[in-house]
Amino acid sequence: MVDAKQRLLSAAVDYVAEHGVGERSLRQIAAGLGTSHRMLIYHFGSKEGLLVEIIRTVEARQREVLADLAHEPGESAGDMARRFWRRISDPALWPNVRLFFEVYGQALQGRPGTTHLLDDVVHAWLDPVIALGIAQGLSEEDARVMARLGLAVTRGLLLDLLATGDREAVDAAMEQYIVSYEAQLPGRTSPLS
């Protein structure tokens, strides 16, 4: 059974995906969810607390997508990465991506209520991506380095896409990264050599 907090959080994720957050107050968000701001404060502590939980939920869902893609039989590492990129760079997710970067920036500046986002914003991704790299044949050391690089490239290109809207150039950059990643896998030769 899903508790009230989980129902509110799920509704908030959907609300942000459809409407974004922008300058909406906690009262406005609550009204959009059909609840009171007091209920949101009770469950999440503050507007910032709610936004951090929305981000964590969206990020967890994205990691689930990655895990599901990793279990596709016969699919190359590059094909899996391309499908994941298409999924997370889908314009339907842009409100969530904008929220991620907004709150991430606030957390880096030390804004109260947001700093606990920093606890797992990188590390929650590393272990599953490292495991994926090892499964694809990388050494643990190489998988660790490539996981961090892949996370940085992906987030950087998402930011580029939001800032410029240049889908063609951003997709070309991601394709180049994927090709260079595949070249690191055992049994592959570098297309750059």
Where do the model's predicted regions map?
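Solvent-exposed, amphipathic alpha-helical segments
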Residues: 7, 11-18, 64-68, 99, ...
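Helix-turn-helix
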Residues: 7, 11-49, 53
